[in-house]
């Protein structure tokens, strides 16, 4: 971001962006040019935050959304389809549990809830259709801890990625990617925001997957775009 030496970065209050010419516009819509198109899928102010969160978590890329649930749904809807399965911990934030129980079931995705403090229970729940392992650690609301390395290694042995909700700890106290997780999600409304004055979410992970979450998960499924004000 070019800030002209400003100590505080500018807030880009634009819905759309101009192209130098038609050819550049075509390249951007085709994903061949990294410039901006529409603030619903990318904004310079939001991109600055995304870069910093990716750096803090030690990930390749990040996607910021309008809320934590926006991050979770945009990410998961990009990773599974009808007939797939998810193995999730039995202790989850209530709204996340609601998405798993109602939203995903309506799309033909099966979610198996197990005690993830017991790796054997996770192993028993994994099938050839399992596409994702999901947990919170510490979990909401009972603060239960999960051995992330053990679960991540178990998933890796079956070719299944682990997604961890790191809302409670933030990267200041815990970096799940360093323990083998593939994805990290946050409700940035809480400890990352810190002051109770914003709503935001984030997902961090491999650049290719984050791009799909941006252009499919947010752009086509949830519309959970983050405001540049937040």
Task: Identify the meaning behind each predicted range.
Residues 21-70, 97-103:
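Conserved N-terminal alpha-helix of the aminotransferase class I/II PLP-enzyme fold
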Residues 62-230:
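Conserved PLP-enzyme active-site core in the AAT-like
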Residues 7-8, 42, 79, 136:
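Selective for proline/serine-rich intrinsically disordered segments
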Residues 18, 58, 206:
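Residue-level marker of positions within ordered structural domains that often coincide
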Residues 1-33:
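N-terminal glycine-rich, Lys/His-bearing helix-loop that initiates the first secondary-structure elements
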Residues 2, 38-42, 115, 202:
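Alpha-helix initiation/capping motif
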């Amino acid at each position: 971001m070019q800030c002209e030496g400003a100590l505080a970065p500018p807030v880009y209050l634009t819905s759309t962006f101009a192209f130098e010419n038609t050819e550049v516009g075509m390249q951007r819509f085709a994903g061949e040019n990294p410039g901006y198109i529409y603030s619903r899928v990318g904004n310079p102010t939001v991109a600055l935050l995304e870069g910093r969160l990716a750096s803090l978590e030690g990930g390749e890329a990040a996607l910021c959304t309008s809320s934590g649930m926006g991050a979770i749904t945009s990410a998961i809807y990009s990773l599974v389809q009808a007939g797939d399965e998810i193995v999730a911990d039995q202790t989850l934030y209530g709204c996340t549990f609601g998405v798993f129980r109602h939203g995903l079931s309506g799309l033909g995705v099966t979610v198996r809830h197990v005690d993830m403090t017991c790796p054997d229970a996770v192993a028993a729940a994994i099938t050839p259709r399992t596409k994702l392992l999901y947990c919170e650690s510490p979990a909401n609301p009972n603060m239960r801890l999960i051995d992330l390395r053990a679960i991540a290694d178990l998933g890796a042995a079956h070719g299944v990625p682990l997604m961890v909700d790191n809302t409670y700890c933030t990267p200041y106290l815990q970096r799940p990617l360093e323990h083998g997780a593939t994805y990290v999600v946050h409700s940035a409304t809480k400890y990352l925001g810190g002051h109770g004055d914003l709503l935001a979410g984030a997902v961090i992970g491999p650049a290719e997957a984050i791009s799909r979450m941006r252009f499919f998960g947010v752009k086509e499924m949830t519309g959970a775009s983050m405001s540049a004000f937040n």
